[in-house]
Protein backbone atom coordinates (compact mmCIF):
# COMPACT_ATOMS: atom_id res chain seq x y z
CA UNK A 1 0.00 0.00 0.00
CA UNK A 2 1.43 3.36 -1.03
CA UNK A 3 1.22 5.89 1.79
CA UNK A 4 1.40 9.07 -0.23
CA UNK A 5 -0.29 12.44 -0.31
CA UNK A 6 -0.52 15.07 -3.02
CA UNK A 7 -1.95 18.55 -2.53
CA UNK A 8 -2.22 21.56 -4.83
CA UNK A 9 -3.40 24.62 -2.92
CA UNK A 10 -4.07 27.90 -4.73
CA UNK A 11 -5.18 31.12 -3.05
CA UNK A 12 -4.97 34.79 -3.93
CA UNK A 13 -1.66 34.87 -2.06
CA UNK A 14 0.11 31.60 -2.85
CA UNK A 15 0.30 28.60 -5.17
CA UNK A 16 1.64 25.55 -3.29
CA UNK A 17 2.20 21.99 -4.49
CA UNK A 18 3.21 19.18 -2.14
CA UNK A 19 3.94 15.51 -2.83
CA UNK A 20 4.74 13.36 0.19
CA UNK A 21 5.71 9.70 0.61
CA UNK A 22 5.83 8.40 4.19
CA UNK A 23 7.76 5.30 3.12
CA UNK A 24 10.51 7.15 1.31
CA UNK A 25 14.26 7.41 1.73
CA UNK A 26 14.57 11.07 2.68
CA UNK A 27 14.70 12.61 -0.78
CA UNK A 28 13.70 16.28 -0.78
CA UNK A 29 13.09 18.91 -3.41
CA UNK A 30 11.92 22.08 -1.71
CA UNK A 31 11.59 25.40 -3.50
CA UNK A 32 9.29 27.72 -1.58
CA UNK A 33 11.00 31.05 -2.14
CA UNK A 34 11.85 31.08 1.58
CA UNK A 35 15.39 29.73 1.95
CA UNK A 36 15.32 28.96 5.66
CA UNK A 37 11.97 27.17 5.34
CA UNK A 38 13.45 25.05 2.53
CA UNK A 39 16.31 24.15 4.87
CA UNK A 40 13.87 23.06 7.61
CA UNK A 41 11.75 21.04 5.18
CA UNK A 42 14.94 19.21 4.22
CA UNK A 43 15.38 18.30 7.90
CA UNK A 44 11.87 16.80 8.02
CA UNK A 45 12.56 14.79 4.89
CA UNK A 46 16.07 13.62 5.75
CA UNK A 47 15.49 12.67 9.38
CA UNK A 48 11.92 11.46 8.91
CA UNK A 49 12.81 9.37 5.83
CA UNK A 50 9.92 11.08 4.09
CA UNK A 51 10.20 11.90 0.40
CA UNK A 52 9.06 15.48 -0.15
CA UNK A 53 8.52 17.52 -3.29
CA UNK A 54 7.39 21.04 -2.46
CA UNK A 55 7.12 24.07 -4.69
CA UNK A 56 5.54 27.37 -3.79
CA UNK A 57 5.05 30.79 -5.31
CA UNK A 58 3.82 33.50 -3.01
CA UNK A 59 3.79 37.16 -2.09
CA UNK A 60 7.24 37.04 -0.49
CA UNK A 61 7.82 40.59 -1.73
CA UNK A 62 5.54 41.53 1.20
CA UNK A 63 6.86 38.99 3.73
CA UNK A 64 7.15 35.23 4.23
CA UNK A 65 4.02 34.79 6.36
CA UNK A 66 1.54 33.58 3.73
CA UNK A 67 3.98 31.21 2.04
CA UNK A 68 5.16 29.77 5.36
CA UNK A 69 1.58 29.18 6.55
CA UNK A 70 0.25 27.80 3.28
CA UNK A 71 3.17 25.39 2.93
CA UNK A 72 2.37 24.19 6.46
CA UNK A 73 -1.30 23.76 5.54
CA UNK A 74 -0.44 21.76 2.41
CA UNK A 75 2.11 19.59 4.23
CA UNK A 76 -0.49 18.86 6.93
CA UNK A 77 -3.13 17.96 4.35
CA UNK A 78 -0.72 15.72 2.43
CA UNK A 79 0.27 13.99 5.68
CA UNK A 80 -3.39 13.37 6.57
CA UNK A 81 -3.99 11.99 3.09
CA UNK A 82 -1.00 9.66 3.34
CA UNK A 83 -2.05 8.37 6.77
CA UNK A 84 -5.66 7.69 5.77
CA UNK A 85 -7.43 5.88 8.62
CA UNK A 86 -4.04 5.44 10.36
CA UNK A 87 -4.41 1.68 10.33
CA UNK A 88 -1.34 -0.28 11.48
CA UNK A 89 0.81 2.66 12.60
CA UNK A 90 2.57 3.00 15.95
CA UNK A 91 0.57 6.25 16.43
CA UNK A 92 2.82 7.78 19.14
CA UNK A 93 6.29 9.23 18.64
CA UNK A 94 8.86 10.93 20.84
CA UNK A 95 12.38 12.24 20.24
CA UNK A 96 14.95 14.38 22.03
CA UNK A 97 17.30 16.12 19.58
CA UNK A 98 20.54 17.87 20.55
CA UNK A 99 22.29 20.32 18.25
CA UNK A 100 25.39 21.64 19.97
CA UNK A 101 24.08 23.61 22.98
CA UNK A 102 20.42 23.32 21.94
CA UNK A 103 18.18 20.50 23.14
CA UNK A 104 14.56 20.15 21.97
CA UNK A 105 12.00 17.49 22.85
CA UNK A 106 9.04 16.56 20.65
CA UNK A 107 6.19 14.19 21.51
CA UNK A 108 3.30 13.59 19.14
CA UNK A 109 0.17 11.52 18.69
CA UNK A 110 -1.46 10.83 15.31
CA UNK A 111 -4.76 11.08 17.14
CA UNK A 112 -6.87 13.00 14.64
CA UNK A 113 -7.30 15.68 17.33
CA UNK A 114 -5.27 18.78 16.41
CA UNK A 115 -3.43 20.41 19.30
CA UNK A 116 -0.13 22.27 19.60
CA UNK A 117 1.75 22.93 22.81
CA UNK A 118 4.81 25.01 21.93
CA UNK A 119 7.50 26.38 24.23
CA UNK A 120 10.46 27.38 22.09
CA UNK A 121 12.23 30.49 23.33
CA UNK A 122 14.13 31.78 20.30
CA UNK A 123 16.49 34.65 21.19
CA UNK A 124 16.54 36.49 17.86
CA UNK A 125 13.62 37.83 15.83
CA UNK A 126 15.18 36.70 12.56
CA UNK A 127 17.36 33.89 11.24
CA UNK A 128 18.71 35.42 8.06
CA UNK A 129 15.57 36.98 6.60
CA UNK A 130 13.19 34.47 8.22
CA UNK A 131 10.99 35.76 11.06
CA UNK A 132 11.36 33.28 13.92
CA UNK A 133 7.73 33.75 15.00
CA UNK A 134 6.85 31.90 11.79
CA UNK A 135 8.20 28.64 13.26
CA UNK A 136 5.14 28.37 15.51
CA UNK A 137 2.83 29.41 12.66
CA UNK A 138 4.21 26.61 10.48
CA UNK A 139 3.49 23.98 13.12
CA UNK A 140 0.03 25.43 13.85
CA UNK A 141 -0.79 24.98 10.16
CA UNK A 142 0.60 21.43 10.04
CA UNK A 143 -1.22 20.36 13.20
CA UNK A 144 -4.59 21.83 12.24
CA UNK A 145 -4.54 20.13 8.85
CA UNK A 146 -3.05 16.76 9.80
CA UNK A 147 -4.84 16.06 13.06
CA UNK A 148 -1.64 15.71 15.08
CA UNK A 149 -1.38 16.32 18.80
CA UNK A 150 2.08 17.90 19.05
CA UNK A 151 4.13 18.98 22.06
CA UNK A 152 7.39 20.89 21.52
CA UNK A 153 9.66 21.63 24.49
CA UNK A 154 12.99 23.47 24.51
CA UNK A 155 15.22 22.15 27.26
CA UNK A 156 18.32 24.18 26.41
CA UNK A 157 19.74 26.46 23.75
CA UNK A 158 21.16 29.90 23.07
CA UNK A 159 21.67 29.96 19.29
CA UNK A 160 18.45 30.62 17.38
CA UNK A 161 19.38 28.54 14.34
CA UNK A 162 20.39 25.59 16.51
CA UNK A 163 17.15 25.74 18.52
CA UNK A 164 14.90 25.79 15.46
CA UNK A 165 16.86 23.14 13.58
CA UNK A 166 16.86 20.85 16.63
CA UNK A 167 13.09 21.32 16.77
CA UNK A 168 12.57 20.26 13.16
CA UNK A 169 14.93 17.29 13.54
CA UNK A 170 13.11 16.12 16.67
CA UNK A 171 9.76 16.54 14.91
CA UNK A 172 11.00 14.50 11.96
CA UNK A 173 12.22 11.61 14.10
CA UNK A 174 9.09 11.59 16.27
CA UNK A 175 6.89 11.64 13.17
CA UNK A 176 8.88 8.78 11.64
CA UNK A 177 8.44 6.73 14.81
CA UNK A 178 4.71 7.44 15.02
CA UNK A 179 3.88 6.76 11.38
CA UNK A 180 5.94 3.62 10.86
CA UNK A 181 3.93 0.41 10.55
CA UNK A 182 3.78 -1.74 13.71
CA UNK A 183 4.10 -5.38 12.56
CA UNK A 184 2.33 -6.61 15.70
CA UNK A 185 -0.68 -4.41 15.00
CA UNK A 186 -1.07 -5.55 11.39
CA UNK A 187 -4.18 -3.88 9.94
CA UNK A 188 -5.68 -2.71 13.24
CA UNK A 189 -6.39 0.93 14.05
CA UNK A 190 -4.20 1.91 17.05
CA UNK A 191 -7.05 2.92 19.36
CA UNK A 192 -9.10 1.09 21.99
CA UNK A 193 -12.14 2.67 20.30
CA UNK A 194 -11.24 1.00 17.02
CA UNK A 195 -11.26 4.30 15.16
CA UNK A 196 -9.23 7.52 15.01
CA UNK A 197 -10.63 10.81 13.80
CA UNK A 198 -9.35 11.90 10.41
CA UNK A 199 -8.26 15.50 9.82
CA UNK A 200 -11.11 17.56 8.47
CA UNK A 201 -13.67 15.08 9.82
CA UNK A 202 -13.80 16.26 13.45
Curated annotation (Swiss-Prot):
One of its GO terms (biological process) is L-histidine biosynthetic process. InterPro entries: IGPD_sf, ImidazoleglycerolP_deHydtase, ImidazoleglycerP_deHydtase_CS, Ribosomal_Su5_D2-typ_SF. Keywords: Amino-acid biosynthesis, Cytoplasm, Histidine biosynthesis, Lyase. GO terms for cellular component: cytoplasm. It is an enzyme of class 4 (lyase). Pathway: Amino-acid biosynthesis; L-histidine biosynthesis; L-histidine from 5-phospho-alpha-D-ribose 1-diphosphate: step 6/9. Gene3D superfamilies: Imidazole glycerol phosphate dehydratase, domain 1 (3.30.230.40). Its EC number is 4.2.1.19. It catalyses: D-erythro-1-(imidazol-4-yl)glycerol 3-phosphate = 3-(imidazol-4-yl)-2-oxopropyl phosphate + H2O. CDD domains: IGPD (cd07914). Belongs to the imidazoleglycerol-phosphate dehydratase family. PANTHER family: IMIDAZOLEGLYCEROL-PHOSPHATE DEHYDRATASE, IMIDAZOLEGLYCEROL-PHOSPHATE DEHYDRATASE HIS7. This is Imidazoleglycerol-phosphate dehydratase. It comes from Synechococcus sp. (strain WH7803). The gene is hisB.
